[in-house]
């Protein structure tokens, strides 16, 4: 069971962290015991008699100039001398090593260079290069080659970095590493090629969201998506639990670019009912999208396994969470295009978060025109205008929200269970709609019917839905 699997994994990781903390404590205890034994041995060397009248010092670094002590025969050593004598017991036998020397930037490996963007899709390069001479280095899609991309005369230009005999060059002299090559081109202002006359001016640093693969510790597989497997994991730096979406290396470049679309959308968002992006790993293959680990699993499975035990108020709170998240996306002109219970996640405290932004798009006018057929379109959740004309908008997301409401109050049932996708389209075009679930409040079913208005303009906004659901929930106290 995915929900139980994720919870079990979290408990395993907490146990591992506790065991590590115990090991550290045991090491500290052993160290203190060794110090105690050493101190005891020193005391035994002094014997049972009275302390000596003076401490024999090996040098004159400590002040003994107190005239009063001299007059008393030096029988009362100063506190500083006693401290020095005791601390000598624990003085390290070896001097500290010299401070580490900083590695010059040009000598750092390629993946540590700020201007190296890894498996960045070619289509995204133009968005990063803004001024003539701006450049970055990336991995060629589908090939084991490196590309130097630079903006010149208003157009991004792409140069394969030739590699032969362990030397790198666009043309002419070779260098032992790509960082050395880039450093030379920047310092000398030598053109990349004689024919192009292009010179490098400013390195474009990688996105702050970029993580190294080494920053992650992968755990067990917890799911599978359209692009590859989904794993649990943690950040090596602070043990933050994460979900890691992977992209199969065998997929063509255009599909890999679509995989990263989800991260591109989520970079801009911060909302308690939207799953949080932590970073992307694009420095090498396979590409990863790293997100917060929502430990309750997906909403559809949650409804089917836990729904019968939930109070109506809890169900209303959860669909209210969905409306709040979608209201936020609506304000950002973001069209989700795949809103469904399977694409929402549930925290351990039953907070719902909108997830799976792989089909999402941001459009300034709030309308997205899709092409390419219906192969990946979730027909039973999709509005008629999107199916018929490829026209997606927040209004088409509202239609899908109505199906999500129906899934919620039918406790995870499948919509149009006895109809194929084509039969569903014909049924809806003729005015057919899903019936009211047995446990659904009448006020909520009226909201569903508003979601399923055939004309997009007749459907309410998510803001209106959120307010109405809050009002309904208050009446169910």
UniProtKB/Swiss-Prot annotation:
Family membership noted in the UniProt record: Belongs to the protein kinase superfamily. Tyr protein kinase family. Fes/fps subfamily.
Bias type Basic and acidic residues, positions: 58-74
InterPro entries linked to this entry: Fes/Fps/Fer_SH2, Kinase-like_dom_sf, Non-receptor_tyrosine_kinases, Prot_kinase_dom, Protein_kinase_ATP_BS, Ser-Thr/Tyr_kinase_cat_dom, SH2, SH2_dom_sf
Stored SMART domains: SH2, TyrKc
Keywords: ATP-binding, Kinase, Nucleotide-binding, Oncogene, Phosphoprotein, SH2 domain, Transferase, Tyrosine-protein kinase
Domain of life of the native organism: Viruses
Residue span(s) of domain Protein kinase: 216-477
Stretches that traverse the bilayer: none
Domain SH2: 115-204
Reaction(s) the record says it catalyses: L-tyrosyl-[protein] + ATP = O-phospho-L-tyrosyl-[protein] + ADP + H(+)
Protein's name in the database: Tyrosine-protein kinase transforming protein Fes
Ligand binding (ATP): 222-230, 245
UniProt gene name: V-FES
Pfam families, sorted: PK_Tyr_Ser-Thr, SH2
Keyword Kinase: yes
Organism per entry: Feline sarcoma virus (strain Snyder-Theilen)
